[in-house]
UniProtKB/Swiss-Prot annotation:
CDD domains: Transaldolase_TalAB
Reactions catalysed according to its record: D-sedoheptulose 7-phosphate + D-glyceraldehyde 3-phosphate = D-erythrose 4-phosphate + beta-D-fructose 6-phosphate
Membrane-spanning residues: none
Protein name per UniProt: Transaldolase
Cell location: Cytoplasm
Natural source organism: Yersinia pestis
Enzyme class, first EC level, given as a word: transferase
UniProt key word Cytoplasm: yes
Catalytic-site annotation from UniProt: 132
Family annotation (NCBIfam families): PRK12346.1 (NF009001), talAB (TIGR00874)
Length: 317
């Protein structure tokens, strides 16, 4: 009998949410996603030590200023890890812009171009890279500009419908709505502690976004992310892409049986509404206390891990 991972692959593009080379070799995903937390964890893997040493040596050649060396080395390390992953996957690697730039459009664009330049210099073309940006108004504007310049983006930390709508209207390549973190918030802040997969607030959110995009003919790819259990993944089968951590990829591979398509849009394509203004975006996003909390919390957590990574690099310089 076919395992659930193989069955899921027939209807959804499976992406690995990890920087672990061993997991890539084992589960053979189409694409891979990284973030500051994943890069920090990957930096602890012994096989990656040479990538850290190379990044530090390179940074020393670029500048004699210690602070600049830290920035250069962390950028180079993220790209070095991405390059290793690209050897093992046929598709794209997502590399994230520093979360501390989440409210700065100009700086986000500059950092994105810096990362792209490092990939290009290593022989990797833009069509194998996605630049990850937080789905703030400023991050979405940065992505809009980058897309026009041929740099595809993955808009992450997406929790509200307003964020999803603004991303589609900006013409971004892909969004990563966070399923599990939405569930976490409702469990922590509501009376209900258990949800059937079809009623899981994260699943409901991604389903609504998927249907809206397809109904209005938006090309933006919907990639569900941040899963807490197998039920969430199975309930979103048919989503354009799903990025899944190795522990859940393992569970899928070890579970037998078919996976049925749950997401599909069969209706007619309808006219797109007028794009959200900045004021409308903030007002609508602000009406969702979960999204406000989780976006801010996600940016803070990624920034903390970026700081830890820089401290590790600084100590080695």
């Amino acid at each position: 009998m076919t395992d659930k991972l193989t069955s899921l692959r027939q209807i959804t593009t499976v992406v690995a949410d990890t920087g672990d080379i061993a997991a890539m070799k084992l589960y053979q995903p189409q694409d891979a996603t990284t973030n500051p937390s994943i890069i920090l964890n990957a930096a602890q893997i012994p096989e990656y030590r040479k990538l850290i040493d190379e990044a530090i040596a390179w940074a020393r050649e670029q500048s004699s200023d210690h602070a600049q060396q830290i920035v250069d080395a962390t950028d180079k390390l993220a790209v070095n890890i991405g390059l290793e992953i690209l050897k093992l996957i046929p598709g794209r690697i997502s590399t994230e812009v520093d979360a501390r730039l989440s409210y700065d459009t100009v700086a986000s664009v500059a950092k994105a171009k810096r990362l792209i330049k490092l990939y290009n210099e290593a022989g990797i073309s833009n069509d194998r890279i996605l630049i990850k940006l937080a789905s703030t108004w400023q991050g979405i504007r940065a992505a809009e500009q980058l897309e026009k310049e041929g740099i595809n983006c993955n808009l992450t930390l997406l929790f509200s419908f307003a964020q999803a709508r603004a991303c589609a209207e900006a013409g971004v390549f892909l969004i990563s709505p966070f399923v599990g973190r939405i569930l976490d918030w409702y469990k922590a802040n509501g009376d209900q502690k258990e949800f059937a997969p079809s009623e899981d607030p994260g699943v409901v959110s991604v389903t609504e976004i998927y249907q809206y995009y397809k109904k209005h003919g938006y090309k933006t790819v919907v990639m569900g992310a941040s899963f807490r259990n197998l039920g969430e993944i199975i309930e979103l089968a048919g989503c354009d892409r799903l990025t899944i951590a190795p522990s859940l990829l393992k569970e899928l591979a070890e579970s037998e049986g078919p996976v049925e398509r749950k997401l599909a849009y069969t209706g007619e394509i309808q006219a797109k509404p007028a794009p959200l203004t900045e004021a409308e975006f903030y007002w609508q996003h602000n009406q969702d206390p979960m999204a406000v909390d989780k976006l801010a919390d996600g940016i803070r957590k990624f920034a903390i891990d970026q700081g830890k990574l820089e401290k590790m690099i600084s100590d080695l310089l």
